[in-house]
Swiss-Prot record:
InterPro entries: PSI_PsaM (IPR010010), PSI_PsaM_sf (IPR037279). Its main location: plastid. It is found in: Plastid, Chloroplast thylakoid membrane. The gene is psaM. Belongs to the PsaM family. It comes from Trieres chinensis (Marine centric diatom). This is Photosystem I reaction center subunit XII. It holds the Pfam family PsaM. GO terms for biological process: photosynthesis. Keywords: Chloroplast, Membrane, Photosynthesis, Photosystem I, Plastid, Thylakoid, Transmembrane, Transmembrane helix. It is a single-pass membrane protein. The chain crosses the membrane at residues 7-29. GO terms for cellular component: chloroplast thylakoid membrane; photosystem I.
Amino acid sequence: MIYDSQVYTVLLIALLASVLAIRLGSTLYQ
């Protein structure tokens, strides 16, 4: 079974990873 806490944790990790990737990409682009 998948608990809501696990889903939220995965979503938070994915969100943080996307934000870090965007910041890294923008830094390398500059």
